[in-house]
Amino acid sequence: MILLKLYLTLAAILCQSRGMTSLDLDDLMTTNPEIQNEIINKHNDLRRTVDPPAKNMLKMSWDNIIAESAKRAALRCNYKEHTSIAERTIGGVVCGENHFMSSNPRTWSSSIQSWFDERNSFMFGFGPTIPGVMVGHYTQVVWYKSYKVGCAINLCPAQSLKYFQVCQYCPGGNVAGRKYEPYTIGEPCAACPKDCDNGLCTNPCAYNDDYTSCPDLTKQVGCNHPVTANCKASCQCTTEIQ
């Protein structure tokens, strides 16, 4: 009888525990400020832990306009393709995009951690250590220049993986030419000693260069030359992270 009572007590505790930890779509909606904070804090916590360390890693913040764009992407229920560049260009800035699909709802922290865990198959400056393995979600999560993020979730009942989570990052990462160097190696905040929050830089550049050659161009001909008219970041941001 004692064993039976003990068993029933344990079963009740387990059921309550499962009930408390179960999730539904409403629990993950990113219109909830608590969910927004969870997403931002998770990203920033992970960005602080990159190995090798980053000297120029920007601190991320939530952006509602980007979240609306991510929502439109999630509503498409298209797991296989990112939204077009035109659709994820916000305020003239091309944003990056990560997808996570699951058969059961997962916390945002869990999904973001899954993206970050691609680092286990990634070597800085080299890329995937296993041919064909995915590492682009990781490099986007830790792309130094991406400092605004917005995310959304949608239920896609026609799919076996029916929970579809999307995050968009601005400016986008995985830039050609340095895709496998998502940041500059160095002592945390070495590039922003006066604008640092626990290892993350807080001085993003509000402008963008239209050409990857802009830093060299501005050094050669200066910022008053017509050829550097589209090099606003290199010309306007002398102390900010760009």
Curated annotation (Swiss-Prot):
UniProt signal peptide: 1-19
Gene3D superfamilies per record: CAP, Crisp domain
Compartments where found: Secreted
Disulfide bridge map: 77-156, 95-170, 151-167, 189-196, 192-201, 205-237, 214-231, 223-235
UniProt xrefs under PROSITE patterns: CRISP_1, SHKT
Entry annotated with the keyword Signal: yes
GO MF term set: calcium channel regulator activity; potassium channel regulator activity; toxin activity
Tissues with expression: Expressed by the venom gland.
Domain spans labelled ShKT: 205-237
Free-text function comment from the UniProt entry: Blocks ryanodine receptors, and potassium channels.
SUPFAM superfamilies: Crisp domain-like, PR-1-like
PANTHER family assigned to the protein according to its UniProt record, in alphabetical order: CYSTEINE-RICH SECRETORY PROTEIN-RELATED (PTHR10334)
Name of the protein in question: Cysteine-rich venom protein VAR11
Domain of life: Eukaryota
InterPro entries: Allrgn_V5/Tpx1_CS, CAP_dom, CAP_sf, Crisp-like_dom, CRISP-related, Cysteine_rich_secretory, SCP_CRISP, ShKT_dom
Keyword field: Calcium channel impairing toxin, Disulfide bond, Ion channel impairing toxin, Neurotoxin, Potassium channel impairing toxin, Secreted, Signal, Toxin
